[in-house]
Amino acid sequence: MIAGVLRRSSLPSRQTLSAALASFNSCISHNLTPATTGASVSSRFTLASSPNSFGIRARNIHIRSEPSMIVPAGIASQGYATVTKDRKNEIKKAKIKISPDNVRPLSRKEIALQKEAAEESTSKIKGTKICIAIRSFVNPEKQAWCLPPHTRKVAMPDTRTLYTVLRSPHVDKKSREQFEMRFKKRFLVIKAQSHELSKKLFWLKRYRILGAQYELQFHCKTRLDMTQVLGNINGSTTNAY
């Protein structure tokens, strides 16, 4: 530990600084040697105490060097840390890189299992594959569009009625036979506002209903004769109020 007091009254001269540093260095080099474990330097430097000079006063400067560390024979110092030889061997073994020669090649069964796992990673149900459900409808004849296989095929809504009748002629009178009748709807009426048309058309295309008939209804309150205006629109219905 070096303790000193530096006081500055004005700008020092070069000769004053060089003389002070030279005497300080000579004192330290004279009293300190590599073999010494402790040294005490007590010196006082008194320079010109005029207001235009630089004054250095080092009072009771104590310099203590720590004892040299004794290194055992089996330990080699590397920087600030010490590592034993056994530890070095362990580190070398841990840093061995796995080369392709050390890796066991996969069997055909393992490769096939990895491929199946990669294919089925997008689905939780075994055997199903998720595909893109939405495709372009620019030219449906050129590009066939289908729903994903895990969803049911959507068509026009229908009603199913299940009948249970007796089988006749038959020996066993308790015999029954079941059949069902399906009534498919040919028309699907969807009522939508103007801001809902795009959403309704999207779902119609998604359910593979590529044909649609639009019916425009105009409701207005006026005293003017609108027959000529509405007559230009084919298939429109006139509601007069």
Curated annotation (Swiss-Prot):
Q: Which GO terms describe its molecular function?
A: mRNA binding; structural constituent of ribosome
> Which superkingdom is the protein from?
Eukaryota
For this entry, the transit peptide stretch runs 1-54
Per UniProt, subcellular location reads as: Mitochondrion
Biological processes annotated in GO: translation
**Keyword flag Ribonucleoprotein:** yes
Cellular-component GO terms for this entry: mitochondrial small ribosomal subunit; mitochondrion
Broad class of where this protein is predominantly found? mitochondrion
Report keywords, A-Z.
Mitochondrion, Ribonucleoprotein, Ribosomal protein, Transit peptide
One Pfam family assigned to this protein is Ribosomal_S10
What the record says about family reads: Belongs to the universal ribosomal protein uS10 family.
How is the subunit organization of this protein annotated in UniProt?
A: Component of the mitochondrial ribosome small subunit.
The name of this protein is: Small ribosomal subunit protein uS10m
What is this protein's gene name?
A: RPS10
